[in-house]
Amino acid sequence: MEDEKSFSDICGGRLALRCRYYSPYCREFGLSSARLSLCSLTAVTCAVWLAAYGLFTLCENSMVLSATIFITILGLLGYLHFVKIDQETLLIIDSLGIQMTSSYASGKESTTFIEMDKVKDIIINEAIYMQKVIYYLCILLKEPGKPHEISRVVPVFQSAKPRLDCLIEVYRSCQEVLAHQKATATSL
């Protein structure tokens, strides 16, 4: 079963939450943000190149124009490959673990997997960001020798920064899977 809903991020931008239910104990949540606009990209590139052309006409040095074009192209490629994330995905399987994937605008993907026996809980935490209180979903990891202590906090959906209403929906569904996993683990 697949479900798609529209939400907004902390800045008011549009987000699409895609929920896939493969089984009662395997769920995937994908948050997609707005793609890079060709108009805004063209406007910024033209503005930088016009400023470079203005400097070129003042100092009559063609190196200024060439360097600006080269730096703009490298900066754009770096932004698309290392910074701009189009989609973040959280896959939770009760007997296996949690996989987080970030898909960049260039097509590059970054994946992190956390085994379920290392997961203590999934919570919604709050933080102060740019003079606002924001909420974020995070995974609490167990301390290896001390199962009642937390070793690390792993934030989820760092790039998308969804609002609380979106996080609550993902949180409730994750808690259903975790509750089944804990019930299965205690019955063994």
From Swiss-Prot:
Record keywords, A-Z: Cytoplasm
Cross-referenced InterPro entries: GPI-GlcNAc_Trfase_PIG-H_dom, PIG-H
Entry GO CC: glycosylphosphatidylinositol-N-acetylglucosaminyltransferase (GPI-GnT) complex
Cellular compartments annotated: Cytoplasm
Pathway: Glycolipid biosynthesis; glycosylphosphatidylinositol-anchor biosynthesis
Name of a matching Pfam family: PIG-H
Biological process terms in GO annotation: GPI anchor biosynthetic process
Similarity field: Belongs to the PIGH family.
Protein purpose: Part of the glycosylphosphatidylinositol-N-acetylglucosaminyltransferase (GPI-GnT) complex that catalyzes the transfer of N-acetylglucosamine from UDP-N-acetylglucosamine to phosphatidylinositol and participates in the first step of GPI biosynthesis.
Subunit structure as annotated in this protein's UniProt entry: Component of the glycosylphosphatidylinositol-N-acetylglucosaminyltransferase (GPI-GnT) complex composed at least by PIGA, PIGC, PIGH, PIGP, PIGQ, PIGY and DPM2. Interacts with PIGQ.
PANTHER family given in the database record: PHOSPHATIDYLINOSITOL N-ACETYLGLUCOSAMINYLTRANSFERASE SUBUNIT H
Listed name of the protein: Phosphatidylinositol N-acetylglucosaminyltransferase subunit H
Biological source species: Mus musculus (Mouse)
Gene designation per UniProt: Pigh
